Regions:
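Carboxylate-rich, polar loop motifs that coordinate divalent cations or form catalytic acidic clusters
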Residues: 1-251
Length: 251
């Protein structure tokens, strides 16, 4: 009887000791993907976005941060599919349904009400997962600008599917997209601006730029403001003509 009791004690000790490293490992992994801090995860900031609850989300080159006016909740990537796919944040976007989308250099995801993330597969060649920018059309389509590819979100399969395999015909490797009042998608790169009908993604216009564009902005969904090294252009997306630059700016 004594031998049986000693054997049971020994087995219990082995079971307890074998559980401890697993628990410690799980706790360590949890700390790796979630942290509460008085400071931001990285000083190199890439994007800002306010969500429906009023939290400020801040993307950096190393981690995502949610700020509540007192502290930062930091999020990092891991091998868990319920976490960020990558730590370098490219874009944070809230759509018309108040969903928060995050694009990284290693994939895209959507924030959930469980305080985790749903990673969204991207169906493009060469296993490219570098998301650059989210755009939403007036009829609720979510596009993913990957610079060299353009994808659209399929809610039935919960995937981003490629529309164009070559979305950068000028090979500039720098491109920003906008939706105008007519639900047209405009793609701006350093040497040209292109217009697509977002309903069928047919190219409707392409305008070469007289100077290399370094920055662009869509104003009131009706005009593109395009900055070059020493000049500002204003392009009316309704008439598809360049407008006269205000004298105070042009001078």
């Amino acid at each position: 009887m004594k031998k049986i009791i000693l054997s049971l004690i020994a087995l219990s000790a082995i079971a307890v000791s074998s559980c401890q490293p697993t628990t410690a490992k799980a706790e360590a992994e949890k700390q790796d993907v979630y942290r509460i801090s008085a400071t931001i995860s990285n000083q190199n900031i890439t994007d800002f976005q306010e969500d429906a609850q009023g939290y400020i989300w801040i993307g950096t080159t190393r981690g995502l941060n949610r700020f509540n006016a007192h502290e930062y909740r930091q999020y990092y990537s891991s091998n868990d599919s319920l976490q960020l796919p990558g730590d370098r944040i490219q874009d944070i976007f809230m759509d018309s349904r108040k969903r928060l989308w995050i694009a990284t250099t290693n994939g895209t995801c959507r924030y959930t009400d469980q305080d985790n993330f749903c990673q969204i597969p991207i169906n493009v060649p060469y296993n490219n997962r570098n998301g650059h920018q989210f755009i939403e059309s007036k009829d609720g389509k979510i596009f993913l600008n990957m610079v060299v590819h353009l994808c659209v979100y399929n809610p039935e399969t919960d995937t981003f599917n490629r529309i164009f395999i070559n979305f950068d015909p000028d090979k500039t490797y720098k491109q920003t997209c906008y939706i105008d009042n007519n639900n047209c998608l405009w793609a701006v790169n350093p040497v040209s601006i292109r217009c697509y009908d977002s309903r069928n993604m047919q190219l409707t216009d392409s305008i070469p730029m007289p100077q290399k564009i370094t920055y662009s902005y869509m104003h009131n969904h009706t005009s593109l403001w395009l900055a070059s090294k020493n000049r500002l252009f204003i392009f009316d997306t309704e008439s598809k003509r360049f407008k006269t630059t205000p004298e105070a700016i042009s001078n």
